Amino acid sequence: MDWSRAKNILIISFVILDLFLGAQYIQMIQTQSKIIREDQINRRQIEELLDQVHVRANMDLLERKMIPEQLGVYKATVSEMEGSWKQEEQGSYIRTFSPRLSCKNEQDLEQILKQQIPFFSDFRYAKALSSDQRRVYVQIVDQVPLFNGKVEVFLENGQIESIRVLHFSQLERLSVVSLVNVHTALYRLITNWEFNANATIKSGNIAYRSKVYNSVDNEHILIPYWYFESGKDYLFIQANSRGQNEEVEKMSISNPNSKGTNET
């Protein structure tokens, strides 16, 4: 074997060894990161991460938010609406009024909704999602908002033009899960989402989101999430302490019916 060939083999061997050691190092860091994320992440580490990605957050405000230690995971079905209600592709029901219904004020509006929707008492007004042309009411489960379950009232000149309803019923608790704290939730968010430069995380809280479980029987799974307000969006990350799925989902605050995304 000539020296040139031997040298090439030696170089290739070093490259392979370097790649192997690099892979081992990355795996070690990921393993350590997992331990930190679940058990040891603290405010100082979060603030360092925020600095690295050039994102601002009011940590005092975020840490003051009181959340439950545990929440249920539920199986549920979409409630059916009869009569003049028409079912839409995504499972919600809509009713259009011609002529439009008059309402004098917010109390008058809610009284009309109670007459039109038999389970309206399951919903609460969501000011952040509402506007002059649309009122949004979010379903409450275990005293926590379920963002997919909602009543939307579309207004024209102060009159009701149409109402859209998506309500979940026949809730069956499948399990109880422990929820991660705000530090772990922020860690998952920061390490799984590409923020715009100089973005701000304004607030954080817990909510449910629904996932289709059985499309034939119209069954859904209700899962607890942390959600954070950033810019014009809510960013959702699973709140389960086991962290099976750490993808970030985005929902537009001004258009909550827009399709969620995992991209910036």
Question: Can you say where each PLM-predicted feature lies in the sequence?
Answer:
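Extracytoplasmic/luminal low-complexity segments enriched in Pro/Gly and acidic/polar residues
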Residues: 185-264
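Exposed beta-strand-loop-beta-strand "reactive/processing" segments of non-cytosolic proteins
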Residues: 115-157, 205-239
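Short low-complexity stretches enriched in small and charged residues
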Residues: 116-125, 183-194
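Short, surface-exposed beta-strand/loop "edge" segments at domain boundaries and coil↔beta transitions
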Residues: 103-104, 142-148, 169-174, 232-238, ...
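Short, charged/polar low-complexity linear motifs in solvent-exposed/disordered segments
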Residues: 40, 179-181, 254-256
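Surface-exposed beta-strand edges and their flanking turn/coil or helix-capping segments
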Residues: 34-37, 149-152, 168, 175-178, ...
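Short helix-loop boundary/capping segments
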Residues: 154-186
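Preferential activation on post-signal-peptide N-terminal prodomains/segments
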Residues: 1-145
